Amino acid sequence: MGGGSRFQEPVRMSRRKQVTKEKEEDENFKSPNLEAERRRREKLHCRLMALRSHVPIVTNMTKASIVEDAITYIGELQNNVKNLLETFHEMEEAPPEIDEEQTDPMIKPEVETSDLNEEMKKLGIEENVQLCKIGERKFWLKIITEKRDGIFTKFMEVMRFLGFEIIDISLTTSNGAILISASVQTQELCDVEQTKDFLLEVMRSNP
């Protein structure tokens, strides 16, 4: 009877060791998985915060709301670009208006806005670029240039090349001139004077 008990005790100890070893192996297996999951969640959180920083209006801080607001904002930007391109193409294709009563070639027609009118009085049709900083990485841009084929397309290409994101934009035209006003932002540091000089040089060059 006593000998049987002494025989069973080593068996129990062996089983305990086996169970303990299996638990340790299971913990060692779970640990890398938990670390990988933690890194994945951190990366996802960082990407969501980066996405949120580009969206001007966020209705809620939940993941689903941030993604939904970003999709809505991207759709609005795409529609704005589409409408602007359509408007500009229509302006390029439209024949110039001629005032039959205006016989003096030195008399310039009235422009569409007082702002453009003041600029035209000072500079005529000469190209002019103004770039003002309105935030840490946000700027207000105004360009006056000659109205010619492909000028708006060139402007959009240059802004993409410089790394600017267009937040808001408007176009105003008069006979022979176009005013582009835009609110833009960039993720990179921007030298205002160098950027102005580069834009002015590009706007003055042939399309």
UniProtKB/Swiss-Prot annotation:
Top-level taxonomy: Eukaryota, Viridiplantae, Streptophyta, Embryophyta, Tracheophyta
GO CC term (a single one): nucleus
Protein name: Transcription factor DYT1
Cellular compartment(s): Nucleus
Reported tissue expression: Mostly expressed in anthers, and, to a lower extent, in young inflorescences undergoing meiosis and siliques.
Keywords for this protein: Developmental protein, DNA-binding, Nucleus, Transcription, Transcription regulation
Region (Disordered), start-end ranges: 1-38
GO biological process, one term: anther wall tapetum development
InterPro entries: bHLH_dom (IPR011598), HLH_DNA-bd_sf (IPR036638), TF_AMS/ICE1/BHLH6-like (IPR051358)
A GO molecular-function annotation: DNA-binding transcription factor activity
Assembly and oligomerization: Homodimer.
Domain bHLH: 28-77
Protein purpose: Transcription factor. Involved in the control of tapetum development. Required for male fertility and pollen differentiation, especially during callose deposition.
PROSITE patterns associated with the record: BHLH
Pfam families in the record: HLH
